[in-house]
Design a protein with these regions (language model features):
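C-terminal, non-catalytic tails of nucleotide-sugar-dependent glycosyltransferases
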Residues: 1-14, 123-124, 133-134, 150-168, ...
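Short, acidic, metal-binding catalytic loop of nucleotide-sugar glycosyltransferases
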Residues: 35-44
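A conserved acidic beta->alpha catalytic loop
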Residues: 51-60, 76
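Glycine-rich, basic loop-to-helix element that forms the pyrophosphate-binding segment
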Residues: 74-91, 101
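A recurrent flexible, glycine/aromatic-enriched loop bordering the glycosyltransferase active site
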Residues: 81, 89, 136-138, 142-151, ...
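Short aromatic/hydrophobic "clamp" motif used to bind/position activated sugar donors
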Residues: 96
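Conserved donor NDP-sugar-binding/catalytic core segment of glycosyltransferases
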Residues: 103-143
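Conserved catalytic-core segment of nucleotide-activated headgroup transferases in glycan assembly
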Residues: 294, 298-307, 320, 431-438, ...
Length: 657
């Protein structure tokens, strides 16, 4: 804004979007809208103002306030559709944004909508509309069988994950609607049969749909909309009802496919059914928590599984249900941005399942404790769904191994009871599932024993080898990598204590200058106390790869645990040889390098460490084998092929292409 108080919005270069704003009085709101547009838009834009013969001094005040703008002046009111069409004709950018004069764009509003409009098959994009108090006004909209429009999330909490994932919607409100200019003009613009306002945006989106193009809601873009700020509520209601009749007559055949709403407020399942009506498949995935991608415990694998489901089946509705909401706000956004609905967790489990009765075609439950916890809910509310049990790791095996190491007495008896209960839960989950996902051939053999004929699919984690992994001479010292979430009973804390007490004293006799660096999340005071002259307790690091590519050997002699260990997958990808036990090596087809890496004897473990640390040729042989494993056995393509085959087995059509 210059010293005179005038606002210059002339684009500095070719505009990426032409913003079309129709005016009919109401200058005070329009001024706020234009000011917000100028303040919160970083990309060059063109502003096209269409004055529909405002009955007051709006046009004069606009001309006095803003410069660098294209103004279309009408002698009579052409209505919203007609005025918008004029603005589109006058615009020069490849992309149009129709913006109400009572719509206040928020910081970062434009890039997500431009991103969506550039995607194949997308015809239009709309933001999350907020009320002035910050609550949700409209998180996308659905239209029922008699043409009534229903805003998703009306007056809801904008922080709620239900309103924070992008998805296809029935239509997007022209309060802020982005569409390609050539496509808009090719369609003939807004139909002026809906003049002066209402339902022209619904009609446009239905015409896009008839061409095979979707309208996408993206909540990363946010716009505050002053509800009916450009007219009275009563006049708006009457216009809506009049134009609904026109809309229903035109689109009756498609509307017959839409659900009939009775009392939306009292029956949220109707809104849910309408929201997901066009989803070709509906998947419910249940796990302990929103995946902590910077931790182990199966979380990176679950994150990748969800990512691949969303990538391979973009037309599916994927709901991720977390049994615990721990750090959900921190870790949910990447899933939400992929179009995955995250529930972490509901405040009322029974109500949540009741509202989604018969909603899902496939339910995937990860881990035995979750299968046991949700078995009753799923049997009652989703009996029609095909069931997948994802072992992640057979927890009873970890407990069995822990029992063997326990001191005896009451604690051993407690562990034995817990082991028996977990074994029973996991066997039941295997037997009741239609198919089973597991992480290793070892787990497959157990499943075959307890459920002969059960169809299993091995889905280990995915890693991507580090390009040009550093060689022998570029590395030094030892690395211990593992999280300590379970505290004193953590497999990694037990392993570290065993390493320091039984293995490294033998190694350090010949290599006293070599340091052991310990990295991993949730380090306890008892682990911190293990620091010493040759042991550095680093703790949590944001970038483990930096450590994995500096160390010469990774060592973690696990004495109990189960499943495929993420820490060693990360070692594969970094080209870092690891030394471990038979428990630690479970699930890794190490082949002829196994004797160089695996032992359950502490003296032999020390000898393996010593040889790898000093023998360049052996180290390079092992590194080459591990990098080959990473690229051929734990690669994304192998994971996807197995996943597509598994989903086809339960009746989900393979993805197009």
């Amino acid at each position: 804004m210059d010293p005179s108080g005038r606002l210059n919005v002339a684009p500095a270069g070719e505009p990426v979007v032409s913003v079309v704003m129709v005016l009919f009085g109401g200058w005070d709101l329009a001024r706020r809208a234009i000011s917000a547009l100028a303040e919160n838009t970083e990309q060059p834009f063109e502003l096209v103002l269409v004055d529909n013969a405002s009955p007051d001094d709006t046009l004069a005040r606009a001309e006095a306030f803003v410069e660098g703008v294209t103004i279309v002046r009408n002698e009579a009111n052409r209505g919203f559709g007609g005025g918008s069409n004029q603005g589109a004709e006058a615009a020069r950018a490849r992309v149009l944004c129709f913006l109400n004069s009572d719509a206040l764009v928020q910081p970062g509003w434009l890039p997500p909508l431009l991103e969506r409009i550039g995607e194949s098959g997308v015809g239009a994009a709309v933001p999350l509309f907020l009320n002035e108090n910050g609550s949700v006004q409209e998180a996308g909209s659905v239209i029922d069988s008699i043409g009534h429009a229903h805003a998703v999330g009306s007056d809801g909490d904008a922080r709620d994950f239900r309103y924070r994932f992008p998805r296809e919607v029935d239509y997007g409100s022209a309060a802020c609607l982005v569409v390609r200019r050539d496509l808009f003009l090719e369609l003939g613009g807004f139909d002026e049969a809906f003049s002066p306002a209402y339902y022209e945006d619904s009609d446009l989106c239905f015409r896009l749909h008839a061409r095979g193009l979707t309208t996408i809601f993206d909540p990363r873009s946010r716009v505050v909309h002053v509800r009916h700020g450009s007219g009275s509520f009563e006049s708006a209601r009457k216009l809506m009802e009049k134009h609904r009749a026109v809309f229903v007559e035109r689109w009756n055949e498609r509307l017959l496919e839409r659900p009939r709403f009775v009392e939306v407020a009292q029956n949220p399942s109707q809104m849910l059914a309408a929201r997901d009506a066009d989803a070709l498949d509906r998947f419910l995935v249940i796990d302990d928590r929103v995946p902590h991608t910077d931790r182990g415990s199966g979380d990176p694998r679950m994150s990748r599984l969800l990512e691949e489901l969303a990538r391979l089946w973009p037309s599916a509705r994927i709901t991720f249900l977390a049994a615990d909401g721990e750090d959900a706000e921190r870790y949910a956004p990447p899933l939400l941005e992929r179009g995955i609905e995250v529930v972490a967790p509901p405040t009322d489990w029974v109500k949540w399942f009741e509202e989604r009765r018969f909603h899902y075609g496939v339910v995937l439950v990860s881990r035995g404790q979750n299968a046991a916890r949700f078995d009753g809910h799923l049997g009652l509310y989703q009996p029609q769904a095909l069931r997948i049990f994802d072992t992640e790791a057979l927890s009873f095996q970890r407990l069995e191994r822990q029992v063997e190491l326990s001191p005896g007495g009451r604690e051993r008896n407690r562990l034995r009871a817990e082991t028996a209960k977990m074994r029973e839960s996991e066997i039941r989950a295997v037997q009741e599932a239609d198919i089973v996902f597991c992480v290793s051939e070892e787990e497959t053999r157990f499943i075959t024993e307890v459920a002969p004929g059960k169809r299993t699919f091995v889905l280990p984690g995915i890693v991507e080898p580090v390009p040009d992994a550093p060689g022998f001479d570029e590395r030094r010292d030892l690395l211990f990598f593992g999280g300590f979430l379970a505290g004193a009973v953590s497999p990694n804390e037990d392993s570290l204590r065993y390493l320091l007490a039984e293995v490294l004293p033998h190694f350090w006799e010949d290599h006293p200058d070599v340091v052991l660096n310990v990295i991993g999340a949730d380090v306890s005071d008892s682990v911190r106390a293990l620091e010493g002259p040759q042991t550095r307790i680093v703790g949590y690091v944001e970038d483990p790869v930096a450590w994995l590519t500096r160390a010469r050997v990774h060592v973690n002699p696990m004495r109990f645990g189960a499943g495929l260990k993420q820490k060693f997958l990360d070692s594969l990808a970094a080209g870092l040889p690891f030394v471990t036990t038979t428990v630690g090596a479970e699930g890794f087809p190490l082949g002829d390098v196994r004797p160089s890496l695996v032992s359950d004897d502490p003296v032999e473990l020390a000898a393996l460490l010593s040889r790898l640390y000093t023998d360049r040729a052996e180290w390079e042989r092992v590194q080459a084998h591990l990098l080959e494993l990473a690229s051929t056995r734990f690669d994304a393509d192998s994971f996807r092929r197995t996943l597509v085959g598994a989903m086809a087995y339960v009746g989900v059509a393979p993805p197009a292409g």
